[in-house]
Amino acid sequence: MNPRRKKRLGVVLAILFGLSATIGLIIYALNQNMDLFYTPTELVYGKEGKKPEIGQRLRIGGMVVEGSVKRDPNSLKVSFDLHDVGPSITVTYDGILPDLFREGQGIVAQGVLVEPTKIEAFEVLAKHDENYMPPEIAEAMKKTHAPLQYSQEQKQGSDQ
């Protein structure tokens, strides 16, 4: 190989190495910032056959269970249970809760799964009013909780 070809080969290899390193870093960054959305039922039973792993970042939406809010009197730590129509999960949060946060209201929490049914949240968002439901919660609840289907025998039995 003559010196000109060696130099050209070196430049091409350097460009390919830089390009592959850039693509690898972009994919790594996207994977680190991807937060999957779950309802409490999907978190407990799995979503499309897969359960989230401990340490995974995720978003979870549901209703705050009445009587489940526990506040630490010496700090801003708060713990509460979240449910949809299935099992409930525990969310812990260290910070100031939104003004609209209260028991029986819908919220979306973003955090890390620390136990199979416990999330350590770093952000809690409350819904706007009693009629509002974030589109992703409504869609997830529609998929997970199909309306009850009654057979003809069941329908006839209820008429008697």
UniProtKB/Swiss-Prot annotation:
Q: Does the keyword Transport apply?
A: no
Q: Which residues lie on this side of the membrane: Periplasmic?
A: 30-160
Q: Name one GO biological process term.
A: cytochrome complex assembly
Which terms in the Gene Ontology molecular function aspect does this entry carry? heme binding; metal ion binding
Entries under Pfam families matching the protein: CcmE
Cellular compartments annotated: Cell inner membrane
Enumerate the residues binding heme.
128, 132
- What protein name does the entry list? Cytochrome c-type biogenesis protein CcmE
**Originating species:** Vibrio cholerae serotype O1 (strain ATCC 39315 / El Tor Inaba N16961)
